[in-house]
Amino acid sequence: MSQESNGGPAAGGGAAAAPPPPPQYIITTPSEVDPDEVRSMADLELGSPEKQVQVQSQKFSSTSSTTKVATHSFSMSSSAGTTGQQSKQDSAQQIQQLQQLQQLQQLQQQQQQQQSQRIISSSTRSQSLQSSTIVGEATTITSGAAQILSASAAASLAQQLKAQSSTSIITSSEQRTSTSTSSSSSTRYIASGSSNLAGGNSNSASSASSKTRFQSFLQQPEGAHGFLTAHQKHVRQFVRSTSAHSEAAAGVAGARAEKCIRSASTQIDDASVAGVVESAGNLTDSSATGGSMQLSMSKLGLQQSSSILISKSAETIEMKSSSAGMRTQLTLSGGFLAPPGNRKITILSPIHAPPGLHDMLKRAQGRSPLSPRISFPGSDSDLFGFDVENGQGARSPLEGGSPSAGLVLQNLPQRRESFLYRSDSDFEMSPKSMSRNSSIASERFKEQEASILVDRSHGEDLIVTPFAQILASLRSVRNNLLSLTNVPASNKSRRPNQSSSASRSGNPPGAPLSQGEEAYTRLATDTIEELDWCLDQLETIQTHRSVSDMASLKFKRMLNKELSHFSESSRSGNQISEYICSTFLDKQQEFDLPSLRVEDNPELVAANAAAGQQSAGQYARSRSPRGPPMSQISGVKRPLSHTNSFTGERLPTFGVETPRENELGTLLGELDTWGIQIFSIGEFSVNRPLTCVAYTIFQSRELLTSLMIPPKTFLNFMSTLEDHYVKDNPFHNSLHAADVTQSTNVLLNTPALEGVFTPLEVGGALFAACIHDVDHPGLTNQFLVNSSSELALMYNDESVLENHHLAVAFKLLQNQGCDIFCNMQKKQRQTLRKMVIDIVLSTDMSKHMSLLADLKTMVETKKVAGSGVLLLDNYTDRIQVLENLVHCADLSNPTKPLPLYKRWVALLMEEFFLQGDKERESGMDISPMCDRHNATIEKSQVGFIDYIVHPLWETWADLVHPDAQDILDTLEENRDYYQSMIPPSPPPSGVDENPQEDRIRFQVTLEESDQENLAELEEGDESGGESTTTGTTGTTAASALSGAGGGGGGGGGMAPRTGGCQNQPQHGGM
């Protein structure tokens, strides 16, 4: 089988051309050629810059050489029909070709003056007569593309290239003549290779019939757009999944490809696909068989190329992607007019990865290369197919800027998973819950996938939220029922985007099961088990709770289980577990548990009475002094002089007067960058970081104009707001507010969220980030509740500080010259106020697990439903995403570069220690992690990341994949750093104070134990370990051993405090 190399004629002039790279091979789809046949796929390869200059100079050096190339290309593209007809067509079209070449010479001179380039080449493909190709740069794409596309298609392509100077677009159409031009050598040269494959020629009758049917389909109001909309997620998934190999290769090349991949993956979108359809629809010649669009990008030394080919007969849509030497092909077969059940997607991968890639990445990164499911089979003979559903064509769910704008949900690549994906073995699970995935792959391929794909964690989109598991189980029951009964599926009662065909069932269509077969019996048994599990789960749902509460309760239960094991490891582990439980778990569900009334339990009454007498004095000492009248909002100061200080026409460039304006402007120019030097901004802004950050962000987003906010009023309010942040707080000050606001701005810029939220929603989220900690006293909610503060009484112990922040902020808006929303309509103002209240209340850390469960349930439910698109078409869904976005920004310190993260950790711990000092002085119990004499910072950060931060960012990354992969990588690196910094466990501190007393008590305690346990405990006593609580009379060596994992507790010993955490280990007798 002949293979023609790509890249144009050989360079002449005595200069030796660079040797061509070895071709990459893939297996073509079985419907096209024999499965054993291999062909080259180097048609998108980019040559070296030197070779590009040589090729261009020789190709356009003379008219004769250009004529030869065009004539040869034309003869290749005219291979159909009989020999006589072919020669006649060649003769006629060669004359026309030569005439057009003369016109091209004139066009060439004009373009040389403009320093731009349009290169025209030709290529041939199997089962289609090829055409010419036009390559255009952004400056000339309109005039170039107008020759083969309509004006609207050319405009859309030009708009795509507006901000992509390094991108080239190739569009082709089958009956256009070949043209060629040249320009400056600085423009990259893209050559289209050719490969002739046996496949036969289509007769003229069938071609004309196909053309008529295709044009008729395109003329339908919602035909083509609806079909492409339904497949939009697959198109994006194809391009993005190819980036996995590009990321892997980047590790070898020493470059990071994420930015390159992210830019390239956004190129194939609604506009470009629509351009391809329009290109194909404009073809009128009966010999034309299709149109194509190709995209090429080169960044960071890596090359990303993608192409789409739509055949004229609507039989296939073929997409190819080439990234860093890795090529992948995807084919949508079945045609536009085929029933949804007959449409298939086939994905083929390279046969071989680069030599040594896997081993090198394992050594460099400690994990295997990313390998998304359904995209890259392990061998050349493994093909993955999944059904393509016929989505709604009335409105694209990807349309931005509207209340119905949605998010395309992607599959996460392999990475370290959080505890949410571990087995909840204490409770009954669905029989298939551990292998259930997002209903993309057919059931019959599950075993094949499991045997091929290795080292991929939860790459199958493992479902962990109970409601999504119930939906998946019911879908499985429905599909199994279709197989068992052989009843044809009816889609009358199903929404179009959730229609299930017979091919979704456990058995492929055309192979029904008959009663009495072993497979029939096994499938029936599995179906009954699945249905029983669904019924059990539904029976436990409480009617007054939402379905996301099921996930919240499950996650809290799993977290308690994890922390129980964590607390048993050491004294510090117990303290960290208690801190996490008391801070991040809302314990409201405890009131729903059945319990005895106090008066029904005399022993409990007596114990409470004794405890009350002992704590009466302590309560009196810890109670906060009487504050201002509760009818007033505490913390609101009198209007300061700066409220009316901006009297001149000129406002400060960045909202603050500073002698270091140039340095400040340089840093503020990076406000869209994750991990900005926020501490330097605070220094250069004369301790006004919140004002300058907020003002710059609102200016750059044009929110002052769209929300009709007077700039002077905005600066007045921000200055007043910043004055109400307590500067003496080490952590909760205006610098923290500026950091959260800047992080919120970056997350709002996520490509997946582009055009999703309105300016009012964006402004509300940023405003909420600005005010979310105003007048923070540097104390926790639990401290305020325990000390019976005026704030806790005012807000009934519920989100005390968050309610106070909102009250202070909205009260400040009433100051003269500070109402930034004065020009809004009443309805808009009410909507924004509600949004801000919801977002700020969600920053209460005790609501963390509920927020996480709500978001994960929403994402997984949409994936199980089969739509793959999260339609944010109601307030609840939209505010839920914004709440989690700001919550992520509030917990973003561990995801920042390590120097910033370490500095934030030091400030937060100092604030905790100050609260602990205050608790010690008041005779109160010192809160977890607040005792400066007994804290392990490194281990606390590892636990904080493992149980709180990583599960949250993991879910967010699932929502906006792949836009948060860099953040997750940084988080894992920071976690590994603190893990490596954990000091070795010290010996028990209480043993040295009175070793003889501890030894005696230890021996007396073990008299009732057998000799084996005695020997084990004595070994543990000699080896030492971390003790539990120090400095108390109830501390025993047995409890110290328990803390070190040496066994049970000792008699008479007092167990460690377990705060607000349920299911903590209680050290009882053996």
UniProtKB/Swiss-Prot annotation:
Reactions this protein catalyses: 3',5'-cyclic AMP + H2O = AMP + H(+)
Cofactor(s) for this UniProt protein: a divalent metal cation
Summary of the function given for this chain in its UniProt record: Hydrolyzes the second messenger cAMP, which is a key regulator of many important physiological processes. Vital for female fertility. Required for learning/memory.
Name of the protein described by the UniProt record: 3',5'-cyclic-AMP phosphodiesterase
UniProt biased composition (Acidic residues): 1007-1024
Keyword Ligase included in the entry's annotation: no
Binding site for 3',5'-cyclic AMP: 732-736, 773, 890, 941
Record's compositionally biased regions (Polar residues): 70-84, 488-506, 1060-1070
Residues that coordinate or bind a divalent metal cation 2: 773
Start-end of Gly residues biased regions: 1043-1054
Biased composition annotated in UniProt, kind: Low complexity: 51-69, 166-210, 1025-1042
GO biological process, one term: thermosensory behavior
GO MF annotation list: 3',5'-cyclic-AMP phosphodiesterase activity; 3',5'-cyclic-GMP phosphodiesterase activity; metal ion binding
Catalytic residues in the record: 732 (proton donor)
Keyword Metal-binding: yes
